[in-house]
């Protein structure tokens, strides 16, 4: 079989995903030998109760499984093994990760400029953006803000359509969606799936998990993969699923939504709810029975008399030996053996690096300027603290008794002011979420993000440092003059930028805000402690604290430069009469342990080098996760599978859990059930 140009056929065979347990317990199977395929012009719906493995299957197909799970089996695209992350396929996650300060039109426009070919004119890109807005039904909310913690935004259905719009801009041949109708009302859910129907009709392959669709939504699906407990209950054409359930002895009643019936047959939560209701009634009436519960609730559903585990096991067994399974296996084999046109691995973006840098910097700057919690609140706090510092150290003077006051003021500026950068960690975490989503979908590269993040934050850091330095220098009466003011500002800018680079590096490795704040606060605390203010450099323990910590400490170099900038060339009054004034250079050397012969610009250069080092480390961490981690995980998977496959508990299937119940009969022969098949 040969594929049409641009079409993507995806097939998976014997897909098993497990969470290894190297102790005495059994290994947990998230997926167990699942087979299936997705084709152009068709929507494949992956259905099942919560915990059935829907999201796990999508993550396995898209190459986004967590690091603590291992996968076996084959995933083939047009007959070849290939990775489907970083732009090869689009993936709309269940969580709508968006920049809440942008409008709908701005979000789509920036994404279009980041990814569409550079040869397109601005007018052509604008036409594509407007067409996408129209196709997704976003005209009414196109100029409204998406919304965040302080801005009211668009509805959940509009956010979901926007998430889909961002991924279909470049017309990907393969689209994955994780529960796109979750949390939506029936009308919004139908509209979203109708959009997917239109996308599939244009020759695209759409694979979507869905929890419990309405009858109207279910009718839009071409194929159905029904999962329960990580196993396949049914795979084939969606319209044939009702017939299979009827042939298996569990026909769908005429007035019931087919998807509701399918989930009722395989969802064990119904048994748990029934058992809980019976137990609660027995507390007041010891003779209360399950039959009485059915009578009091007026239910005529014969499924209530049969444990769900038995129904599920029967369906799984009957599907494996059914004609539906044989037909699906033949189709999967046909798709897996495709020859001819093989889709080349391509990037999700088709524009050049410099345009991406400009657009991404502009978008990030706008986001920072509109988010009050990113920089504006911190700038306000910095101004208030600067006024407090200025009033406490007001006109500190040049008396010998004020030498330590000058050092304390400089230490506070270099220490606590940089420590305040941790206040923006929540914004860093949110930005990293957006980056992770866009990077996995191939919107842009790691290098352009690393540089653009630095460039977009600089104007706010400069404003922050200018306001802080202007207030403190004027009120404390530090050395006046353009060069001293310029150095003071530049020293503070470099120190704060270095800390923010460190925070971004931490945000790239920690999973949540709390862990990031703990690590960031601990790290900055160590840097402040060894910066040379709380204990001067000559008094620091030589092992570890002096060498090497103080030499790789941005705070130590920034504080040295600040002391030199203030004290060199200044004379302090002597404590004794007729004794010459003390030079600032002498105080630097004898009291603070700082070599005055070393240029303050050298200290600033070292801070800049540490800043660059943090940015390179940030880049290296992101690249490691992208390039090296998959290789390490592949080796881990091979070794883990070879280990757990030797265990009898892994090879042995879970025993039938409900032997105490009587053997059930076909529901079509039971009284009170009206099946549309008869």
Swiss-Prot record:
| Residue span, ABC transporter domain | 10-254
SUPFAM superfamilies in alphabetical order: P-loop containing nucleoside triphosphate hydrolases
Q: Which GO terms describe its molecular function?
A: ABC-type transporter activity; ATP binding; ATP hydrolysis activity
Q: What induces it?
A: By NaCl.
Q: Which domain of life is it from?
A: Eukaryota
Q: Which residues cross the membrane?
A: 374-394, 409-429, 446-466, 490-510, 513-533, 602-622
State the protein's name: ABC transporter G family member 13
* Originating organism: Arabidopsis thaliana
């Amino acid at each position: 079989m040969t594929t049409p140009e641009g079409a993507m056929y995806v097939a998976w065979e014997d897909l098993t995903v497990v969470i290894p347990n190297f102790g005495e317990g059994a290994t947990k199977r998230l997926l167990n030998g699942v087979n299936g395929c997705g084709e152009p012009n068709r929507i494949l719906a992956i259905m099942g109760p919560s915990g059935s493995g829907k999201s796990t299957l999508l993550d396995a197909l898209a190459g986004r499984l967590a690091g603590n799970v291992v996968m076996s089996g084959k995933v083939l695209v047009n007959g070849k093994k290939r990775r489907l992350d970083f732009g090869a396929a689009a993936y709309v996650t269940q969580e709508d990760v968006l920049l809440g300060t942008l409008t709908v039109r701005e979000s789509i426009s920036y994404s279009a400029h980041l990814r569409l070919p550079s040869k397109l004119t601005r007018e052509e890109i604008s036409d594509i953006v407007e067409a996408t807005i129209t196709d997704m039904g976003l005209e009414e909310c196109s100029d409204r803000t998406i919304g965040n913690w302080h801005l009211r935004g668009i509805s959940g259905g509009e956010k979901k359509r926007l998430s889909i719009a961002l991924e279909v801009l470049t017309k990907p041949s393969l689209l994955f969606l994780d529960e796109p109708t979750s949390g939506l009302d029936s009308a919004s859910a139908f509209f979203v799936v109708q959009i997917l129907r239109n996308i599939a009709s244009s020759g695209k392959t759409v694979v979507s998990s869905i929890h419990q669709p309405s009858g109207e939504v279910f009718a839009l699906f071409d194929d159905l993969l029904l999962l329960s407990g990580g196993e396949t209950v049914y795979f084939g054409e969606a319209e044939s699923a009702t017939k299979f359930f009827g042939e298996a002895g569990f026909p769908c009643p005429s007035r019931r939504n087919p998807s509701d019936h399918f989930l009722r047959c395989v969802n064990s939560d119904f048994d748990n709810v029934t058992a809980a209701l019976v137990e609660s009634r027995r507390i007041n009436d010891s003779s209360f029975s399950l039959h009485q519960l059915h009578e009091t609730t007026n239910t005529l559903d014969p499924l209530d008399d049969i444990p769900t585990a038995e129904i599920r096991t029967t369906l799984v067994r009957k599907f494996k030996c059914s004609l539906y399974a044989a037909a699906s296996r033949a189709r999967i084999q046909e798709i897996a053996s495709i020859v001819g046109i093989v889709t080349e691995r391509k990037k999700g973006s088709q524009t050049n690096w410099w345009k991406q840098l400009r657009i991404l910097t502009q978008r990030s700057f706008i986001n920072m300027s509109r988010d009050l919690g990113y920089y504006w609140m911190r700038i306000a706090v910095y101004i208030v603290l600067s006024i407090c510092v200025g009033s406490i150290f007001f006109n500190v003077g040049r008396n010998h008794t004020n030498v330590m006051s000058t050092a304390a003021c400089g230490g506070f500026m270099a220490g606590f002011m940089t420590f305040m950068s941790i206040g923006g960690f929540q914004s860093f975490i949110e930005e990293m979420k957006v980056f992770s989503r866009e990077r996995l979908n191939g919107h842009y590269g790691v290098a352009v993000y690393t540089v653009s993040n630095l460039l977009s934050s600089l104007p706010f850091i400069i404003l922050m440092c200018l306001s802080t330095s202007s207030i403190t220098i004027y009120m404390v009466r530090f050395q006046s003059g353009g060069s001293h003011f310029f150095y003071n500002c530049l020293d503070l800018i470099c120190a704060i930028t270095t800390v923010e680079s460190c925070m971004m590096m931490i945000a790239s490795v920690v999973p949540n805000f709390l862990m990031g704040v703990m690590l960031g606060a601990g790290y900055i605390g160590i840097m402040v402690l060894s910066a040379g203010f709380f204990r001067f450099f000559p008094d620091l323990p030589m092992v570890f604290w002096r060498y090497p910590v103080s030499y790789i400490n941005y705070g130590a170099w920034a504080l040295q430069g600040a002391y030199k900038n203030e004290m060199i060339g200044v004379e302090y009054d002597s404590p004794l009469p007729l004794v010459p004034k003390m030079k600032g250079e002498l105080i630097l050397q004898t009291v603070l342990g700082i070599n005055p012969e070393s240029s303050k610009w050298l200290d600033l250069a070292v801070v800049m080098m540490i800043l660059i080092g943090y940015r390179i480390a940030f880049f290296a961490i992101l690249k490691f996760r992208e390039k090296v981690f998959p290789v390490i995980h592949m080796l881990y998977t091979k070794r883990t599978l070879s280990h757990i496959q030797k265990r009898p508990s892994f090879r042995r299937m879970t025993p039938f859990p409900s032997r105490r119940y009587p053997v059930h009969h076909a529901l079509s022969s039971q009284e009170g059930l009206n099946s549309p098949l008869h």
